[in-house]
């Protein structure tokens, strides 16, 4: 190098440490070649001694530093020190006489470069130029060095991700210990009721044991002791990830738990004192109980993010690739379970809000109901076309047409009309004097509605039409497959019985041949449905019904709605059988002069029975159901393969039952005590929130199969994931589950 006019010293060590060079006279390639990295590179070589002996920095002709070129250590993530002032000491300048020492940058052996510092003559310095392209024969060597740096950075980043996972897991286990062993234990010792403790902390003890006794120890052993020989995470996570589904129960209960904490803090001084005394401790970090309760809700999505980052850095041919991908799939499933539970809780909260707005006029707080859309709308008067303010609530099974109430608190709307989605029609209309109008037509009445804009009208029409179509698709699940259930009830029915359907929800079974009550074979099974009740006129004479002089009746054979004049009466075993004229003339109800010696033939039931689900199911079959434990009804129950976490129940039309769908992950199962004295065989109880149902099977074995399948779904799992999973069932003939 030149100083003032002058002499030169070997620039290698200075360049390697990022010291100022001599300006235009130094070569960038020479600096890279002089970088003392590698296992044999040390500060005791001749070039280093020469540099250490000269404590002054080279300057240009002006006496100032000619440059401060910074040499980054490329992909290793470590930058060399930038330019420093004269006399600054670096680690490799201390103890030079002590012989070989570790490298300054601690580089991997694969990154080792030539440790010999080349001697650069003044002529070579004068001929070199910083802006020149590097020598062609040195270019492959530089490419090899960059490739080595890139290969080294991958394993290091994987190790950093693993260490981050371990660190966050240790912190998380401490939070779980705080919730389980401090808050929960102290509140229990203080005498807080057990049901309150369970409502607040749910299954936090199980989550704590899983992480503290299984996941954390395995991660710690692998990352701190075995990583050099077995750098893998996928095998551990794949083995333990299925247990993360237990978070579903905690997440579903979270909002209720937070509400309990707030309520008991306000109403119980003892509860408040215990919680506040713990929150003041250093282990709480000045955070509230609710804040710590939130951590399990957020933990599973964090696993998913870390594992995605790990897979992104993992080479395609790595031995851990398949295990890591499978682990991500399982963890994503657990995260989806948690998210689904959150969405169900949010939907239920919305239903409860609407229930309060309606003042409890309609019992809509049912897990099968789903609020799809609500909004203000105007109804055009049928008399003079005057617009009137109204409010619509669109659910998956009905529309509530409401009138606003002028109240600041409490009930906001009164239900004027309830319209079932089944049989509903929506139609766009164009009127010359009124814009943005459409008509909703139900079984009992039609509503002409108006929106503020054309876009709002189109949105309402599209959403209502989509809801109608979806309801039709769901109703087809319960179409005419009554042979499986009705034959099990009545063996006299032929397996080849033709099945027809007059509606997507309620099938009608027709028979050919055979004998019926008193020598009569019904042509159809009768049913008393809501649709029949809503019919306005007699099918025979056409006169309009009213509640006083023209009442509705049903034919006991074909089920049509008729008036009293159009029916005939015949005594039969001290009972009356009302039939229409057509059925009476074709096939009389009873012989006009029955023989007292003739044995009475068993009368075939004219009521429809629940029908089977044609879709493949994990478990399906006939059950008995009761909401009170006293009155029982026959139902067809099915857990479909397409959605194994819901229970479909289809009841007989004589019970006025509509299809019900019960979300199983939010339900609780129990077997009633013998003291309850439920006289219906093998019974168990299914409970959701404040609603409960009693279900009864025909045998203990069948009861056990239902309990196992329902329990699996209630835990947020699926039958396919559990050992000994049930085989899918397709109802055919009279097969029972």
From Swiss-Prot:
Q: State which gene encodes it.
A: FGD3
**Phosphoserine modification, residue list:** 128
Q: What is the lineage of its organism?
A: Eukaryota, Metazoa, Chordata, Craniata, Vertebrata
One annotated GO molecular function: zinc ion binding
Query: What Gene Ontology terms for biological process does this UniProt record contain?
Result: cytoskeleton organization; filopodium assembly
This entry carries the following GO cellular component terms, namely: cytoplasm; cytoskeleton
- Name of this protein: FYVE, RhoGEF and PH domain-containing protein 3
Bias category Low complexity: which stretches? 500-512
Q: Where is this region: Disordered?
A: 1-151, 487-533, 589-620, 713-737
Q: Its biological function?
A: Promotes the formation of filopodia. May activate CDC42, a member of the Ras-like family of Rho- and Rac proteins, by exchanging bound GDP for free GTP. Plays a role in regulating the actin cytoskeleton and cell shape.
Q: Report residues binding Zn(2+) 2.
A: 555, 558, 580, 583
Q: Which ranges of the sequence are coiled-coil? A: none
Q: Where are the FYVE-type Zn fingers located?
A: 532-588
- Cite the InterPro entries for this sequence: DBL_dom_sf, DH_dom, FGD1-4_PH2, FYVE_RhoGEF_PH, PH-like_dom_sf, PH_domain, Znf_FYVE, Znf_FYVE-rel
